[in-house]
Amino acid sequence: MIRDITLGQYFPGESAIHRLDPRVKIIATLLFIIELFIVDNFIGFAIAAVYLGAVIAVSRVPLSFIVRGLKPVIIILLFTFALNIFMVDGQIIWQWKFLHITVEGVRLAVFMAIRIILLLIGSSMLTLCTRPLSLTDGIERLLSPFKKIGLPAHEIAMMMTIALRFIPTLLEETDKILKAQQARGADFESGGLIQKAKALIPILVPLFVSAFRIAMDLAMAMESRCYRGGEHRTRMHEMKLKGMDWAAIAFLVVFLAMIIIESRIF
């Protein structure tokens, strides 16, 4: 299950989505996330799902690979669904002692589950279709106007990209440690939820040691290549919006317009 997490991973490809300017993809992802928290009806979520489905189809990333990334958050989805369905007051449709299910609770629980699923898939598509270096350059260019007030745009972009890339790396290390300890007789499967959580405590120390080792190796690699931050750094390919990028922006504007019109009508 740990290997199933797709957030932070890059899926190599030459699709139109892969070739888009990273700034366009970053802004589109941010607007998509904001839209998910604004929408409060099924039609709005349907529009968002169609938009995301079109992006996935054009990106040529296998749907099975994307859906696999939802497995690790199934427990969170179920917990959130149960919390909303039983804790929201309103028109009661079922009741047993202190437990009750309301129309408003069911509606909110379904909306929250859809929102989390679309949020995870949409966020994953950014890293799946964008090379780490391109992602760093895109974030830096978007933050570059703030350099005038002393904001270290390149350093912040580098830290954000490294943090994202560390997610699959740490998960892979966790999987290796779990398998190594299971080979030595450790049991992580038996017992209830609390016992399973306690059984995972012994992996924390080797995981932290491994994380610091990876970070040190990365720092030494950057030092050996004379990395000195963003000052006076040049690029082989300067970013410039092309026809495909403007087409993607137009598609994004149409999507946002549909959401705004739908929210006013319904």
Regions found by a protein language model. Give the residues of each.
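Transmembrane alpha-helix interface motif
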Residues: 1-42, 50-57, 141-151, 155-158, ...
